[in-house]
């Protein structure tokens, strides 16, 4: 059995027939499976015990040898080895084919590898393989050409004419002969020569052939191995046959497919022995070829083989493919032991780090622990009796359970887990009933509510797992959201309402104007009903200052840590969030958790005290509504008249009418807000941020306003009524459009957003923080992101938590904002520094960025900046790629789906929302493309024959003309100076054009700004660095233009680092370096272009990826997370990273030897770069010793 942690990479290749025979435990000769009477496997059949091992532990087929003492004996009667039955999962068999057959993957894939090697078209190849045409193998002295196809009649004529002077054949045998003859070295030389001489289509073909030839040459695979003489038979336990209740059998489709192969093979053997006529043998060979094709990839060629009920049988390829395939179903998503699930209810009395676990569930989950403790404490004599005690639920079991779960965290998860906060650890508290209780403040992270949501519980078993759960996953340690560094655990709903009510002040309340000597006296007065909760009073603080406040605020400030000062204002949701963030920044985790629990207790208590509820009388309709509507009607009528007289166009009328109604709606809303009392229940709920918003109040008490029709165009007939008055039939009908569209959108959005997240995770899963400093001198310049006049992302947001690359000085006062020392020490900018830079009016700052990071696999600490989830420095081993993918994908469901239709305006609609994000990350040509200037210069706009043209005059006087398509809006003005890459018309820029004009730096800035724009317009904040990680992955590859003296192939995609390395080698040997141009890959393409074939195969296009990998003999270095999960190793991130795992304790006072260094640093980390500077110095010293 292979030991999991002693290999660093895994390789895939073609299997030669000898290799398959070597692996095999025996030949399967008969198509039989099991005997219908004895239900025992048939000898030499597909389930044969002699080949695959015994069906029952330590027992041979005939029963002569039973029991473990005969271990390893081979029975002399039935030939079965006595061993564990589990070997039936591991032992392969094989089928010796009577005629060679081609492997469909290599013949049918795109491009056809066999076709490329033989320089034949796949169509010609198919004719030969399926016995339609002959192929000339040896022309001899005939006028025929090698590899020429002959029909049956032509072949006969030539046979009669030339006799045995030439050789031709059909089927896989003929192709095999041709493949054996290939000399790879020579072919590669010829093709390289051809590359220099030809161009166009022929050059492309030559490059593709050379790729395949090089692949075979480098990998040590032989071309003839693409033709199979032997078919391996996978172990029987992986294609089981089980008896159903009714005595019938259910079997895997593979058994059917294998049976067809064996039947046809045996028939072919018999025909060959009998010396049957050629035509019959040929037909049988063709059928054998088709049977093997169906076994490997059913349905790839011709009609798929179907089982009962016309269902296509699942072949070996289907076993790997898709969501239900081996990769995604069993290797990347396993079911786990020690887990349970139940409905969740709120636990308002829990502390931040606790959850309520139902007693019976806890007993089941912790059963082994409880049993062990029962034995240890002497309640039971052995494990068996302890198990009985637990099953009978004796009273002492509960006491033991209490002990066991103390300090043993459990993990709670809610599907869909959109980001890492979807699974957190808690300390369990036993509760009665059958529902899990969770803390109300973690609901935001889980996106949970209590309308019947369920959650799963998992138990971390080992001590390490428990420690990690407690230190890294405990809810109290996950207060900040990794996507923007803002608190995710902050008060909501009732808690907000209670705090808001508590901190409000009311004029003329009982006890207003009273003055107290300290807070205690004020509280005493309140307890004795001398002063009300919201009356304005004056209190002297400890430091002697007098403060006008209310009793409510005094109570509220009791839970606020003193360091934060006295909070003397009305606390709505935003203020509370700020308080939490402030507390976290200044006082850290533990204090914040306490603060949250304090606010929770107060909030619930006082929202109950307030007795805030909602009733029909709370909704008061403003008096002014009638008047406002009447005025609007009048204006609309005027416009209608103008339209009928032909003074304005339909378009103008539409726009004006919509303007009027929007205006009227706003006025009604303003009037409504003015009439509501600030202690009105509905008003308080909305303004505190507990539930609802002004728009919803407007619909209840003002007017519903304008609605959109199904296409998204706004209907110019408003709904004048509100829900308090009730809608007319027509109004009701109009509003159904919006309601239905909302629901349909939500459903679509969830699926699209999930798929986007999956692609993002796949492209960035191997980005891990791997070193302290990559030593780059490059960086990016950041400035505020603006959209026309409004700012989308302010400069300070982009700077905070990043490492600066230049000294920043205040332009007016000359004050140093960022010192040289800070730049040299790579310290991140604080919030205060970032704000100071923005306030100083500085436009742009150069910072370190993931985009320009030079770390080979992953990123370095300084380029990444601070860890948003903790606010501290990022650790080596943090899987920042996954965090970035989750941060971008998780808010995806909040983005809109719609393409905005500007009511009937000409010109393409610009895509927005989720589709726009997808368009950017996939680097697609956008809908409604803008024209981009290819050079700097000044603008002239002309009209030629009714078409508009933009002429750019360069500085050297050259002119360039761009035709403007009909209906496009021009963005530039006459005489304006522009730079290359600027947009000339409205619309979205094609990123590939931008890459050509402005190079990678231009595209990076553009993509970053565009993605931010979409999210910010929806009110979602995401930190730049997450988007930068994705952009970096999209720009990892370059396309080779000229190979120079390197081994590289023109037209190939290659990693920038590999490219630089190859060039360095070439230059060192005095050769010409290769020339390449940067390419922008969409995330799907980038995922498939990764070094790891396991990761690519488990993502999409499984068969294609594996075919290519096998031919190239690819090696997977297992650097990413997915590859390691697939083969069952610990992921190389976090505590699973080799530098954290290979810890060897050396005795004190012993010298540190060279071999210790080898033990301490595995192969891959022996690189110096992995060490921090101090470590390097230590190392050099020890080596000198």
Swiss-Prot record:
Keywords: DNA-directed RNA polymerase, Magnesium, Metal-binding, Nucleotidyltransferase, Transcription, Transferase, Zinc. Mg(2+) binds at residues 449, 451, 453. It comes from the Bacteria. Binds 1 Mg(2+) ion per subunit. Binds 2 Zn(2+) ions per subunit. It catalyses: RNA(n) + a ribonucleoside 5'-triphosphate = RNA(n+1) + diphosphate. The RNAP catalytic core consists of 2 alpha, 1 beta, 1 beta' and 1 omega subunit. When a sigma factor is associated with the core the holoenzyme is formed, which can initiate transcription. Belongs to the RNA polymerase beta' chain family. This is DNA-directed RNA polymerase subunit beta'. The gene is rpoC.
């Amino acid at each position: 059995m292979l030991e999991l942690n002693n290999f660093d990479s895994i390789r895939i290749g073609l299997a030669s027939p000898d290799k398959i025979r070597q692996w095999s435990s025996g030949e399967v000769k008969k198509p039989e499976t099991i005997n219908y009477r004895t239900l025992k496997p048939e000898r030499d059949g597909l389930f044969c015990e002699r080949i695959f091992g015994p069906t029952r532990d330590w027992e041979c087929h005939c029963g002569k040898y039973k029991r473990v003492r005969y271990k390893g004996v081979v029975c002399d009667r039935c030939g079965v080895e006595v061993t564990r039955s589990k070997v039936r999962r591991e032992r392969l068999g094989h089928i010796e084919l009577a005629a060679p057959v081609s492997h469909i993957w290599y013949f049918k894939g795109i491009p056809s590898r066999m076709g490329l090697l033989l320089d034949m078209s796949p169509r010609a190849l198919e004719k030969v393989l399926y016995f339609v045409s002959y192929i000339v193998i040896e022309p001899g002295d005939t006028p025929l050409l090698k590899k020429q196809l002959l029909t049956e009649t032509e072949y006969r004529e030539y046979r009669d004419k030339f006799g045995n002077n030439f050789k031709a054949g059909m089927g896989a045998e003929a192709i095999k002969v041709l493949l054996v003859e290939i000399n790879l070295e020579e072919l590669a030389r010829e093709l390289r020569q051809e590359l220099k001489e030809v161009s166009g289509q022929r050059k492309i073909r030559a490059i593709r052939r050379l790729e395949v030839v090089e692949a075979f040459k480098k990998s040590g695979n032989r071309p003839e191995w693409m033709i199979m003489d032997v078919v391996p038979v996978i172990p029987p336990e992986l294609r089981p046959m089980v008896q159903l209740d009714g005595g019938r059998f259910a079997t895997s489709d593979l058994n059917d497919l294998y049976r067809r192969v064996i039947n046809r093979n045996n028939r072919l053997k018999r025909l060959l022995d009998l010396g049957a006529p050629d035509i019959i043998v040929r037909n049988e060979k063709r059928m054998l070829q088709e049977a093997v094709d169906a076994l490997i990839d059913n349905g790839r060629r011709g009609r798929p083989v179907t089982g009962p009920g016309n269902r296509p049988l699942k072949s070996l390829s289907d076993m790997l493919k898709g969501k239900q395939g081996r990769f995604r179903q069993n290797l990347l998503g396993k079911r786990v032991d020690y887990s349970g699930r139940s409905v969740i209810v709120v636990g308002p009395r829990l502390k931040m780090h606790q959850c309520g676990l139902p007693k019976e569930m806890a007993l089941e989950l912790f059963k082994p622990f409880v049993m062990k403790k029962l034995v240890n404490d002497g309640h039971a004599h052995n494990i068996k009796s302890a198990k009985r005690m637990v099953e009978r639920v004796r009273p002492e079991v509960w006491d033991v359970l209490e002990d066991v779960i103390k300090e043993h965290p459990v993990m709670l998860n809610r599907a869909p887990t959109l980001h890492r906060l979807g699974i957190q650890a808690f300390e369990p508290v036993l509760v009665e009933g059958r529902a899990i209780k969770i803390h109300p403040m973690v609901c935001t992270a889980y996106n949970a509510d209590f309308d019947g949501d369920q959650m799963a519980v998992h138990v971390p078993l080992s001590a390490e797992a428990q420690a990690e759960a407690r230190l890294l996953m405990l809810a109290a340690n996950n207060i900040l959201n990794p996507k923007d560094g803002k608190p995710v655990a902050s008060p909501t709903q009732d808690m907000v309402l209670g705090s808001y009510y508590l901190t409000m002040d009311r004029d003329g309340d009982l006890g207003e104007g009273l003055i107290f000597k300290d807070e205690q006296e004020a509280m005493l007065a309140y307890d004795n009903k001398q002063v009300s909760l919201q009356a304005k009073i004056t209190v002297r603080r400890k430091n002697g200052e007098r403060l006008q406040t209310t009793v409510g605020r005094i109570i509220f400030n009791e839970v606020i840590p003193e360091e934060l000062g006295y909070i003397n204002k009305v606390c709505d949701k935003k203020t509370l969030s700020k308080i939490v963030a402030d507390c976290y920044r200044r006082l850290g985790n533990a204090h914040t958790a306490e603060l949250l629990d304090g606010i929770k207790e107060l909030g619930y208590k006082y929202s109950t005290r307030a007795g805030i509820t909602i009733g029909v009388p709370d909704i008061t309709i403003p008096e002014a509504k009638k008047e406002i509507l009447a005025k609007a009607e009048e204006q609309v009528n005027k416009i209608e008249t103008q339209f009928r007289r032909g003074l304005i166009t339909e378009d103008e009328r539409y726009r004006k009418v919509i303007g009027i109604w929007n205006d009227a709606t706003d006025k009604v809303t303003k009037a409504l807000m003015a009439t509501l009392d600030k202690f009105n229940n509905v008003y308080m709920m909305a303004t505190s941020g507990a539930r609802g918003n002004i728009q919803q109040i407007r619909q209840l008490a003002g007017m519903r306003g304008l609605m959109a029709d199904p296409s998204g165009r706004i209907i110019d007939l408003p709904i004048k009524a509100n829900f308090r008055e009730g809608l007319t039939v027509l109004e009701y009908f109009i509003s159904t459009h919006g309601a239905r569209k909302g629901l349909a959108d939500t459903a679509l959005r969830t699926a699209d957003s999930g798929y986007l997240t999956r692609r993002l995770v796949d492209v960035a899963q191997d980005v891990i923080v791997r070193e302290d400093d990559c030593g780059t001198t490059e960086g990016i310049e950041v400035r505020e992101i603006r959209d026309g006049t409004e700012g989308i992302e302010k400069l300070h947001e982009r700077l905070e938590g990043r490492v600066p690359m230049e000294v920043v000085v205040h332009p007016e006062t000359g004050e140093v904002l960022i010192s040289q020392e800070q730049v040299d020490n790579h310290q991140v900018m604080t919030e205060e520094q970032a704000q100071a830079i923005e306030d100083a009016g500085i436009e742009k700052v150069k910072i370190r960025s993931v985009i320009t990071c030079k770390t080979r696999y992953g990123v370095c600490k300084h380029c990444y900046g601070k860890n948003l989830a903790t606010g501290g420095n990022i650790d080596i081993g943090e899987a920042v790629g996954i965090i970035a993918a989750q941060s971008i994908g998780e808010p995806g469901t909040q983005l809109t789906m719609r393409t905005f239709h500007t009511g009937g305006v000409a010109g393409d609609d610009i895509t927005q929302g989720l589709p726009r994000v997808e368009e950017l990350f996939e680097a697609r040509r956008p809908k409604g493309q803008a024209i981009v200037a290819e050079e700097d210069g000044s603008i002239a706009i002309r009209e030629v024959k009714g078409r508009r043209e933009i002429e750019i005059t360069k500085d050297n006087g050259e002119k360039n003309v761009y035709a403007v398509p009909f209906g496009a809006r021009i963005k530039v003005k006459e005489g304006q100076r522009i730079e290359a890459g600027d947009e000339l018309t409205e619309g979205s820029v094609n990123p590939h054009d931008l890459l050509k004009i402005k190079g990678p730096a231009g595209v990076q800035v553009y993509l970053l700004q565009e993605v931010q724009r979409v999210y910010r317009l929806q009110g979602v904040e995401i930190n730049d660095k997450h988007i930068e990680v994705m952009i970096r992955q999209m720009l990892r590859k370059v396309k080779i233009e000229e190979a120079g003296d390197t081994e590289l192939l023109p037209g190939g995609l290659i990693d920038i680092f590999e490219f630089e390395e190859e060039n360095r080698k070439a230059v060192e040997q005095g050769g010409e370096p290769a020339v390449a141009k940067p390419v922008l890959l969409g995330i799907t393409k980038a995922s498939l272009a990764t070094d790891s074939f396991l990761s690519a195969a488990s993502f999409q296009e499984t068969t294609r990826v594996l075919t290519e990998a096998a031919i190239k003999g690819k090696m997977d270095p297992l650097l990413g997370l997915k590859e390691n999960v697939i083969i069952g190793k610990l992921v190389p991130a976090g505590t699973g990273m080799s530098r954290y795992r290979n810890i060897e304790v050396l005795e004190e006072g012993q010298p540190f030897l060279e071999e210790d260094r080898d033990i301490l640093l595995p192969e891959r980390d022996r690189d110096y770069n992995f060490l921090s500077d101090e470590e390097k110095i230590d190392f050099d010293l020890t080596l000198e010793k």
